[in-house]
């Protein structure tokens, strides 16, 4: 089924398509139960539904949501918001550009783990504040890229990769299954020459998180080896149907 409406989105261009076509098919076939935390207008939730997922959308702002699918109003700063959504119900938890908005990122991650059913997988994205452009900006101006006064006002929690993997995930009882950067080898900038300079500098410096404007993170529960695994039969571009 194709959506008659396509709600707008402020997410990085192409990120939703990347998740649907290149990432999710490595772990799932469509048809499982999924929840979109921080659904916004409903753009990603609609695409998940149209691809065959059984989707629930959740967000604090009811007024922005325009997709005709089930929606629950939730405050992600609540200590146990998972209790309102159904602990252990979801094979897939998606949260695109949300964790940087919450007051307690470890608490947010714990709630994500509670929502996962055994073998379930969570997919998060967040601005890459470890990138070369971010490091250059902090060196020159002392401000964090995509977190400064010119950025989204509700960006309050920068996610630094070393701290995230070394402290946040163990405390939330989650384990890292996969880490991607988007765009994979570059940056989305208004000045192409500047993006080229940043790529050149990144190649000289070396390091895992120097490229890309966004972290794309796949997580599973670390409790009793309950994490999901990539599905070798579901690799390649996702077309809305599956051979699984």
Where are these regions (language model features)?
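Short glycine/proline- and charge-enriched loop/turn segments
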Residues: 140-150, 194-199
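Acceptor-substrate binding/catalytic loop of class I
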Residues: 146-163, 167
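Conserved N-terminal segment of class I S-adenosyl-L-methionine
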Residues: 1-88, 92-96, 106-109, 124-126, ...
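A structural motif corresponding to the C-terminal end of an alpha-helix
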Residues: 167-174
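A short glycine-rich, Lys/Arg-flanked "PGG" loop and its adjoining helix->strand segment in the class I
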Residues: 107-121
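Conserved class I S-adenosyl-L-methionine
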Residues: 124-146
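A short His-aromatic
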Residues: 97-101
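Short N-terminal helix/helix-N-cap motif within the alpha/beta-hydrolase-1
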Residues: 103-107, 134
